[in-house]
Amino acid sequence: MVLLISEIKDIAKRLTAAGDRKQYNSIIKLINELVIPENVTQLEEDETEKNLRFLVMSLFQIFRKLFSRGDLTLPSSKKSTLEKEQFVNWCRKVYEAFKTKLLAIISDIPFETSLGLDSLDVYLQLAELESTHFASEKGAPFFPNKTFRKLIIALWSSNMGEIEDVKSSGASENLIIVEFTEKYYTKFADIQYYFQSEFNQLLEDPAYQDLLLKNVGKWLALVNHDKHCSSVDADLEIFVPNPPQAIENESKFKSNFEKNWLSLLNGQLSLQQYKSILLILHKRIIPHFHTPTKLMDFLTDSYNLQSSNKNAGVVPILALNGLFELMKRFNLEYPNFYMKLYQIINPDLMHVKYRARFFRLMDVFLSSTHLSAHLVASFIKKLARLTLESPPSAIVTVIPFIYNLIRKHPNCMIMLHNPAFISNPFQTPDQVANLKTLKENYVDPFDVHESDPELTHALDSSLWELASLMEHYHPNVATLAKIFAQPFKKLSYNMEDFLDWNYDSLLNAESSRKLKTLPTLEFEAFTNVFDNEDGDSEASSQGNVYLPGVAW
């Protein structure tokens, strides 16, 4: 950059103060100065960024003045002259050159800089001016959608401070995207409407389709919020002074939003993005779809992912929320749903952070009294078996869950109290001998490898695992498990009291517990643990050494 701030200020002052068109050629000189030096990793090292930011703001002031003078507005055909039209067209070409420079800054700078944020703000302020001065006639509704479309391309081309998929959500941390989302997209209804509309058209353009589909992280950063213009409680403003009435068409917005989502869901998603989408799908995606049933294929594929990909992890668990929403609201019929739900229950489930989410949903799915006792018994038995190798924080969730299931499905009580194995004082010697033989030869009939919960023989089994838990090393688990050795007087447990327990909360509860009586302790006080290195056993002889005869 050759021009100094003082020179830029002088040129800008002459251009904005006077209406002399001879000075307008200086605009081209200023635009040509708006160039980012090559092979630069940051602009803060010198005055370059400061000068470029000042140049951008000066050019914005100049073009705002040109808008107010009407130099960028084509005159009506009656008042038009050839000279006037040529001048306006020349001004517009210079104006387009400035916008192109701004877009280049937004899309090409690979490092975080305030210049990019300034360029974004200036570009959108220019779009606001266009909505007033580029309308077909004064006061006519207008939104500069072509200008906006170019901005979308620049945003999706930007890699400013890009740390794609590093966040646990899989969303982009691109500074430009974050700024655009927080400052514009989540605040203005017209920007949301035209963004979805133009994005949809770009997805249909082969020239830009690949660019958009590869940057799902930016899309997630943009739409992962509750302030969509189709939301009932969204309190959004209008960005341009007089937008077209089309922005009130909620159905069209939902249709575009839906098409964009479906296109991106068919693209390449990272595992983190997959999880993030499934986490928000039931609250932030389905309500804004015009036809939510179009998500059926995506959700069923996600739910079935476990059988085809052992590394899928929690994806089927997260897909449950969306599936349940479609089943509840749109009567989605899913074949073998309970078989798939049963297959999700495995040792890994007890260690994932979405365990509470899964148990909340499973509580709903297994609450129906129309379910067969064999099916419910399989879920009870499999959960009980998993407690033998689960952490205490998971076990304290499973125990009340099993208790509630047995209360809802009394036919499963036989797994706890089987009359065939109970002796009574009126039995004959032969009956006593037969009972003894029956107990000695007992083999648990439960087939843990069977994938169909109707065929596991769980109802013929017993919950001996719960008896093992009564002797668990953790006192909370042992105490809680003993509820099964008592009469079932409690109606049910409130599962919310148990779902969010972890090692930290268990330790905190134990350490903060107030004891009614202090435990009785007996101990001896020692001044040393070992004898001195020189073998001096004087202290040992006096009884002040814990390990006499051992030198350290």
Swiss-Prot record:
Assigned keywords, A-Z: Nucleus, Ribonucleoprotein, Ribosome biogenesis, rRNA processing
GO CC field: 90S preribosome; cytosol; Noc4p-Nop14p complex; nucleolus; nucleoplasm; nucleus; preribosome, small subunit precursor; small-subunit processome
InterPro entries: CCAAT-binding_factor, Noc4
GO biological process: endonucleolytic cleavage in 5'-ETS of tricistronic rRNA transcript (SSU-rRNA, 5.8S rRNA, LSU-rRNA); endonucleolytic cleavage in ITS1 to separate SSU-rRNA from 5.8S rRNA and LSU-rRNA from tricistronic rRNA transcript (SSU-rRNA, 5.8S rRNA, LSU-rRNA); endonucleolytic cleavage to generate mature 5'-end of SSU-rRNA from (SSU-rRNA, 5.8S rRNA, LSU-rRNA); maturation of SSU-rRNA; ribosomal small subunit assembly; ribosomal small subunit biogenesis; rRNA processing
Top-level taxon of the source organism: Eukaryota
A family per Pfam: CBF
Subcellular location: Nucleus, Nucleolus
Keyword hit for Kinase: no
Other observations noted: Present with 1630 molecules/cell in log phase SD medium.
Function statement: Involved in nucleolar processing of pre-18S ribosomal RNA and ribosome assembly. Has a role in the nuclear export of 40S pre-ribosomal subunit to the cytoplasm. Its subcellular location and association with pre-40S subunit are unaffected by RPS19 disruptions, suggesting it acts before the ribosomal protein.
Assembly description: Interacts with NOP14 and MPP10. Interacts with snoRNA U3. Component of the ribosomal small subunit (SSU) processome composed of at least 40 protein subunits and snoRNA U3.
Family as reported in the entry's similarity comment: Belongs to the CBF/MAK21 family.
Full protein name: Nucleolar complex protein 4
Gene: NOC4
